[in-house]
Design a protein with these regions (language model features):
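Catalytic nucleophile loop
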Residues: 102-119
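Non-globular targeting/processing and membrane-anchoring segments
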Residues: 1-104, 121-127, 131, 138-228
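Short loop/edge segments at beta-strand edges and connector loops
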Residues: 112, 134-136
């Protein structure tokens, strides 16, 4: 079924009605962001050693001399042949923003549990340029809730019990470097990652939208960008 066809006067009236609803949502989003920024932080006392292109690095090293670090927990299991398709969809939105983040004293790094060689080979295949490091041999993924512990009867994901959850799951964690201390300020998972996918938000502006309602699951249509 196509859209209703109306006069420009009717279209303008309906657009203004929608705008009246959009503006409070914008203000609510701003207030939520302010609340997020005001959250307290916890000190990261565990030592993690990541494998990077330039050698072993601590979590503090991943800041790259900046005060803030955003970690994208990219799903790539140690024995996987390829990275997760949906994480790859998200990562397609990351390239090109690094220089802008740097000018706000912020670094963006992807972290996965797979060996570094696999990550870099897959990054080359995808044509990405953002930093990607391996947390293999550390508890980083488990501690930040994206690798489900095998010995836990009911694992937790997104701050709630997730019966049956196994392996790797996606997330974002945010850190602040304060007087040499690494502080954890925020993590989000599942639909909380939606705000980071620009492609979805472009689709949300269109009459057809995401076109996912009739699919077996929402992202059943998603492929790695070299597999469409």
């Amino acid at each position: 079924m196509g859209p209703r066809i109306v006069s420009s006067e009717v279209w303008r009236a309906e657009r203004l009605a929608l705008l009246a609803e959009e503006k409070p949502l914008d203000r609510a989003r701003d207030a939520l962001s302010e609340w997020r920024r005001a959250l307290p932080a916890t000190a990261v006392t565990q030592t993690y050693l990541f494998a990077t292109e330039t050698g072993p690095a601590t979590l503090a090293d991943l800041f790259g001399g900046r005060r803030q670090l955003v970690v994208y927990h990219f799903m790539y299991g140690a024995d996987w042949a390829q990275g997760c398709p949906s994480c790859s969809f998200w990562a397609d939105n990351f390239d090109g923003i690094g220089v802008h983040l740097a000018h706000r004293d912020t670094s963006l790094v992807a972290v996965s549990i797979a060996p570094l060689a696999k990550l870099l080979a897959y990054r080359d295949r995808m044509g990405w340029g953002f930093p990607w490091v391996s947390s293999a041999g550390t508890r980083f993924n488990q501690d930040f809730g994206v690798t489900m512990p095998e010995d836990e009867p009911v694992p937790e994901y997104n701050y709630a019990p997730r019966p049956g959850a196994t392996g790797e799951l996606p997330g974002i964690s945010v850190f602040l470097l304060d007087q040499g201390r690494v502080l954890h300020s925020y993590s989000t998972y599942a639909r909380g990652l939606d705000m980071l996918n620009g492609a979805y938000h472009f689709l949300d502006l269109t009459p057809l939208g995401r076109q996912e309602a009739d699919l077996p699951w929402s992202m059943a249509w998603v492929r790695r960008h070299d597999q469409y």
